[in-house]
């Protein structure tokens, strides 16, 4: 890559070696992705003065001021990895100017390689796409262009998307679904015999205070200050977009209270999230389409597809990470010691189960890393199926296409997790993705759901059968 940017072969080798040694040194003192899932261990408060005293070779204040962030806005900091900063501080003091120059050059190269010549872009894809992920070819030009518009002006595109694909009737249906799932999760909380009344009461308080976002934000981003100039290069316009986003972030957040109406995904994103620090659940319009949601389908389909997604995000508020935050999003313990012990014992069983799954002949899953997502998948299934029973109790659904309502619920769930994935990508995801692979979000979750056995008549000797006393349950 350095040579493609005009550097000599000798300089390219020298820079590459320096960068590799530097980043390897930092990798050895970085927490693993599993360790980063512990909110308490990664919540280390210190003042700006303490930070500067602890790490004198990291000019944090000067860097922040250079970005337009005043020192008065950063007098209190949360340092996720003190050991990393300690090592980086020592490394910065020891590095010579040529290494620091190489690092800065590489930062520019990596951040610009997708926006310059085809030769540079293809070299970037050869490594990150082919070598790291096993992809055979890059996205076509139309998709790369569309993705770029989405990345830089996501809400402008989202506003058009919602007008065309997300009617008000769909939003109202989702509001009803969310309400029914909240009722169901409350019932599941009450049903846990291992949990004390005092902790259940706190759980209900948190559940009742969920801030729900559906479809699109209440206020749209104003892009009037963003100037896209056709006379300038593609990369120059990308930089203009980045500067606009950076300036906007600082202007709206530095020294300001948290904006609970801010969205962390664009409306057209096919995803959903739970944010523990604001106790909010968000379902963008992009995921409120088939095969997750169909306004013309019956409850069996919608509760099995988007219903489980809703239950999944709600359960995140009570998984191994989310349970450590209270109803207002503060990192605060609201569990009795016995209840916390009971939770951890059950959660450990999930971690062990998914760690024993062979995703490839020579590779097991990482149940500890994927614990929160696996708990949310199982909880989402339990909560959504219970909600389906509630809403159809007085008016049972009929069989359709030869399948019972219960069967169609589970088929709808399984249908959203089909994947066409390379072996290289599997290996990457096991290391880097906190979700289990799509196959195991189905085959690893359903064998622990009693209703699934009843729906399909699964019996001893069948491939996915697990004895009842070995099935896991938390929510």
Stretches found by the model and what they are:
Residues 175-307, 316-475:
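Zinc-dependent metallohydrolase catalytic domains
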